[in-house]
Amino acid sequence: MKHRAFRSIILAIVALLSIVPAVYPRQEKKPKPITPITIEMAEPAQKIMGLNFDRAKLDSVLENLVEQLESFEKIRSISLPNNIPPAILFNPIPVGFQFERVKKPFKMSPPGKVVRAKNIEDLAFYSVGQLAELIRTRTVTSEQLTVMYLNRLKKYGPKLECVVTLTEDLALRQAKQADKEIAKGKYRGPLHGIPFGVKDLLSVKGYKTTWGSVPYKDQVIDEDATVVKRLENAGAVLMAKLTMGELAMGDVWFGGKTRNPWNYKQGSSGSSAGAASATAAGLVGFSIGTETLGSIVSPSTRCGTTGLRPTYGRVSRTGAMALSWSMDKIGPICRTVEDCALVFNAIQGADGVDQTLYEAPFNYDPKVDWKKLRVGYLKMEFDSVRSNKAISDSVLTVLRKLGAQLIPIELPKLPLDGLRIILSAEAAAAFDELTRSGKDDLMVRQMKGAWPNSFRSSRFIPAVEYIEANRVRYLLIQEMQKLMKDIDVYVAPSFGGSNLLLTNLTGHPCVVLPDGFTKEGTPTSISFIGQLFGEAKLLAVAKQFQDATDYHLKHPKLQE
């Protein structure tokens, strides 16, 4: 224990002193000379880390501190773009856990008879499954849908502030190509010809990838993200790069504040702000968002969309902005649960580049045998709901009517708030160059809770404490597995207790979907959590709940 504390003070003090000198440009190749370190410098520095070594012990570490600082300068002389990951890879799989290995045919619900509306704009809120059937039967063309959605993006996008870049030329080319292929009998599947948008942290060749931030608003990354490539291979049509909260926080970006289509006075929440807003407003067939800590769940709740946050290690982040290498996840934001299944089926799987990915089958089947299904619910969180409690209680009523035998459960009791430093430290590393160059001063939000201050504050997190937090995270993963081995899926208030933070740390998948409306007329949501790599069963259960309600069929009145 003494040795660990000794190492902690070394790294803690060096972490502090490393930010005292003037800002060093990342491009500098020659390390700067190191300022001598004295006890007078080290003594107050240790207090910030909660340490209390006497002067004799501090004196004995001074030489080591200088050597460490020299090492830091050598590292800082190397340019590390955002897309370079750390060599340490996060593993969400608990000891003894086994996921399904056998791949089975993907099954979707029969489309039934889908009638084309007389006015093509009335198709704007159709599900992906419905649009796919119209395209497959050549009742409507991809080009017709694409033009309709492009017109809506131009008409409603400015007021919602949900679009960064229209990829109009690309979209029209892709739509025409889709129509040609389908006319020749080369139908690629249910996403063929479907127009969509992506959160503007996914790179698209030939277009800006702004990350929602002033310092990057003219950035062009000359590659297509893996998710973009896979959707293109599925025949989908990319129409727009959609807004995101600056560097994946909130709904404020360099061009404004993305709006909730149900209430324009509200922001859409974030950080997948434009993806949720545009999908809810019927400006795209579906969209792609990301989540590190609530960025699919929160805007989907605010805007009334259905979102899937997949298991960590399911969807490639290649070509996506990194915020937290051990917590970032990419998933669809749609109008229905089954739409999420269709999109997820196209984007999941290893790509040979993102080394955190696992090859696990996605055996989706919408049928559910409630007699064999073990469904848990967070009893304490449901009992503690204050606002909109009747809505939350109605979720349990619906599930019981469907045949679910609900099992009350409790989440593991560990100091989760302390683990937030994992995200803070990784985010600070991902944007180290931005901070040390001083360009973080260009960012829109500069209050204490915004990224610039968070990045600076996180330089005071000792490396030892970051590692210790991840050791506690390991315990959390094992404890969560003890809970999940007895249930298949559990339901939770989307913002009830520690569930959102906990499951983002453990990597468990989540489906968030509307479950009602407030008295002000804005959507509310409920979340379903599944086994690691258990998206198939999770989506099937969530679909059963959604089919028993009609909240997803209601749409906002838009302002021009």
Regions found by a protein language model. Name each.
Residues 1-10:
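Bacterial N-terminal signal peptides that target proteins for export
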Residues 55, 61-293, 311, 397:
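Gly/Ser-rich catalytic/binding loops embedded in alpha/beta enzyme cores
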Residues 138, 193, 233, 237-239, ...:
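Glycine-rich, small-residue loops and helix-cap segments
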Residues 109-122, 191-211, 369-378, 421-477, ...:
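Short helix-loop capping/hinge segments that flank enzyme active sites or metal/cofactor-binding pockets
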Residues 223-347, 493, 504, 508-527:
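Short glycine/serine-rich loop segments
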Residues 139, 144-150, 176, 384-412, ...:
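Acyltransferase
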Residues 10-19:
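Bacterial N-terminal signal peptides
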